[in-house]
Curated annotation (Swiss-Prot):
Name of the featured protein: Chemotaxis protein CheY
Entry cofactors: Mg(2+)
Keywords: Chemotaxis, Cytoplasm, Magnesium, Metal-binding, Phosphoprotein, Two-component regulatory system
Additional observations: The signaling mechanism of chemotaxis in B.subtilis appears to be inverted in comparison to E.coli.
Subunit structure: Phosphorylated CheY binds to FliM and FliY.
Length: 120
């Protein structure tokens, strides 16, 4: 059975790019969200195997959403994706429970490496 993934990014183009990489490699994208608040709702609704989460988004940022999802499901597997290679953001995300961090613009193999490492 394919692993079920939730993609969270406020940019439709980024969601499309990540979805394309995942679908071509046998993953099932169960839902997409464009902000952190939507991400929390979609997580509750779909219970995905993994979440790719942008950090900078309107309404609720990715780190806040990460913390809220972790309160719902301590075992949640979340990979942060962000153009900000800022050390403090990476540290905040990892301390909040993120499993990995991908810096945009990313290569498909880096996305797959992070996802496969997190799922196994």
């Amino acid at each position: 059975m394919a692993h079920r993934i939730l993609i969270v990014d406020d940019a439709a183009f980024m969601r499309m790019m990540i979805k394309d990489i995942l679908v071509k490699n046998g993953f099932e994208v169960v839902a997409e969200a464009e902000n952190g608040a939507q991400a929390v709702e979609k997580y509750k609704e779909h219970s995905p195997d993994l979440v790719t989460m942008d950090i900078t988004m309107p309404e609720m940022d990715g780190i806040t959403a990460l913390k809220e999802i972790k309160q719902i499901d301590a075992q949640a597997r979340i990979i942060m994706c962000s153009a900000m290679g800022q050390q403090s953001m990476v540290i905040d995300a990892i301390q909040a429970g993120a499993k990995d961090f991908i810096v945009k613009p990313f290569q498909a193999d880096r996305v797959l490496e992070a996802i496969n490492k997190t799922l196994n």
